């Protein structure tokens, strides 16, 4: 498989944070670190936009998906509000991660903490065709649990 070449820029020069990286040889996502100057305390139910200190330039036809880290979700109830978040190939601003604390205790985001993961994926752009009717299928309009719980 041909790698997707992504240009990356540190927002603040001289940053001590590592660039996003794969943590295992077969990982699908690169971990993103929190670029906060001071500890950020999230009380239960609170959400915050956490900066990552990086901006990227994706090749046309690719997106970056920002996804939660399962360990933070399981151990602390930390999730992403818009999961997955999408970074479009024409966006050049800093990547921010909107996290929410669904846990019972306060959660502290510290500088350099791995808060999310970034997965690169190709996408297609659809053309919409306005029609009066759609073709029939066996499923029809069944949804929202129609096959069971």
Swiss-Prot record:
This is Deoxyuridine 5'-triphosphate nucleotidohydrolase. It comes from Geobacter sulfurreducens (strain ATCC 51573 / DSM 12127 / PCA). Its EC number is 3.6.1.23. Pathway: Pyrimidine metabolism; dUMP biosynthesis; dUMP from dCTP (dUTP route): step 2/2. It is an enzyme of class 3 (hydrolase). GO terms for biological process: dUMP biosynthetic process; dUTP catabolic process. It catalyses: dUTP + H2O = dUMP + diphosphate + H(+). Pfam families: dUTPase. Substrate binds at residues 69-71, 82, 86-88. SUPFAM superfamilies: dUTPase-like. Keywords: Hydrolase, Magnesium, Metal-binding, Nucleotide metabolism. One of its GO terms (molecular function) is dUTP diphosphatase activity. This enzyme is involved in nucleotide metabolism: it produces dUMP, the immediate precursor of thymidine nucleotides and it decreases the intracellular concentration of dUTP so that uracil cannot be incorporated into DNA. Its cofactor is Mg(2+). The keyword Protein biosynthesis does not apply. Gene3D superfamilies: 2.70.40.10. InterPro entries: dUTPase, dUTPase-like, dUTPase-like_sf, dUTPase_trimeric. The gene is dut. Belongs to the dUTPase family.
């Amino acid at each position: 498989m041909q790698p997707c070449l992504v240009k990356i820029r540190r927002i603040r020069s001289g940053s001590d944070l590592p660039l996003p990286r794969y943590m295992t040889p077969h990982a699908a996502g690169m971990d993103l670190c929190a670029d906060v100057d001071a500890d950020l305390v999230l009380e239960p139910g609170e959400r915050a936009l956490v900066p990552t200190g990086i901006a990227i330039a994706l090749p046309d036809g690719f997106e970056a998906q920002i996804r939660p880290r399962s360990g933070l979700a399981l151990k602390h109830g930390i999730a992403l509000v818009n999961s997955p978040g999408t970074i479009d190939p024409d966006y050049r601003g800093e990547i921010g991660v909107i996290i929410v604390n669904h846990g019972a205790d306060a959660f502290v985001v510290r500088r350099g903490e791995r808060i999310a993961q970034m997965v690169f994926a190709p996408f297609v752009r659809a053309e919409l065709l306005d029609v009066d009717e759609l073709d029939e299928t066996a499923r029809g309009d069944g949804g929202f649990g129609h096959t069971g719980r």
